[in-house]
């Protein structure tokens, strides 16, 4: 995805046409009724379930294309669809339909001494560009979220998920048509030429309002470096768990294994475990044992190696590595102060968790750690819009402008001010 490709006149013309169609669709979509949007979403979910066999067949072709390649297991996992994941995809769309419509919501209202009545009201962003790699479910999640928020969306999938994404996209368009909404409200770029990505990053002649990348570090870095429009993104999910001396050991064991091993290839998977130095005798060995029993490779600091000398030594690079695999770095730290210092040094500001029963420790963690998502006594794998009750997410944002954390329906809106007067003039 990082390759720099000279723009092709044909690709530029194609992409600019897609941009014009998206912008034209965004206007009526911005004031479409909640009923129409929900009708479209439920029809999309129905179409996905009705076409499950076709989607799975197309996904099998995508998977066959990468057979024999040196592809990471985490990549294959993200690309793979099955009955359960398709059902979850459809259910996610229905959950988005069930959410309150953010468009037109009055966020704040106040009266001025001169009698002016001011309201801040949610509005759609306009046209969202979503560039993603191996996750075909993004076609459904992003399309549904953007629609609910009154936005048009241009989806550019990776070549690896092309067939799967196309099969899902057909279902999304079917839902739009069923509700009488513009079919160009959700478009999938029909070519795999990387010049299409460059065209989107340039904004398609002003059509795109925001870009959201979903993929590996190289893709996100390219988008952040080259985009001429605002970007909602995270570069990587370097997530930490700190186990305090006050932590309930059985709870800590359960959470640590889940945070690392439930799905190792997602951005909310834990990559570093920090154990309070005061808990070396009570917590460290049991935590190492449950991770090893779960099939996780441990890369250990010098202090950890003194307790478990058979482990692999962690290098400096390990502390800043997003493994996306069954590997975790483990270190001991000097209490909550040491944990915060380590996280500040190596974190990607995505998600961090503290396991502790001491409320003072939890309060310091929540106050001083500056990541988008902080958890207490819960797995980092809850870093997900669906788990937050957002129905789904278009991604996780770690920046501090506009959207941070899971980017759901509300985060895909802007706002405007409505000011009502009764003939006031400014003195």
Curated annotation (Swiss-Prot):
It catalyses: L-glutamate 5-semialdehyde + phosphate + NADP(+) = L-glutamyl 5-phosphate + NADPH + H(+). Its main location: cytoplasm. Keywords: Amino-acid biosynthesis, Cytoplasm, NADP, Oxidoreductase, Proline biosynthesis. Its EC number is 1.2.1.41. GO terms for biological process: L-proline biosynthetic process. InterPro entries: Ald_DH/histidinol_DH, Ald_DH_C, Ald_DH_N, Aldehyde_DH_dom, G-glutamylP_reductase_CS, Glu-5-SA_DH, GPR_dom. One of its GO terms (molecular function) is glutamate-5-semialdehyde dehydrogenase activity. It is found in: Cytoplasm. Pfam families: Aldedh. Pathway: Amino-acid biosynthesis; L-proline biosynthesis; L-glutamate 5-semialdehyde from L-glutamate: step 2/2. SUPFAM superfamilies: ALDH-like. One of its GO terms (cellular component) is cytoplasm. It is an enzyme of class 1 (oxidoreductase). The keyword Secreted does not apply. Belongs to the gamma-glutamyl phosphate reductase family. NCBIfam families: PRK00197.1, proA. PANTHER family: DELTA-1-PYRROLINE-5-CARBOXYLATE SYNTHASE (PTHR11063:SF8), GLUTAMATE SEMIALDEHYDE DEHYDROGENASE (PTHR11063). Catalyzes the NADPH-dependent reduction of L-glutamate 5-phosphate into L-glutamate 5-semialdehyde and phosphate. The product spontaneously undergoes cyclization to form 1-pyrroline-5-carboxylate. This is Gamma-glutamyl phosphate reductase.
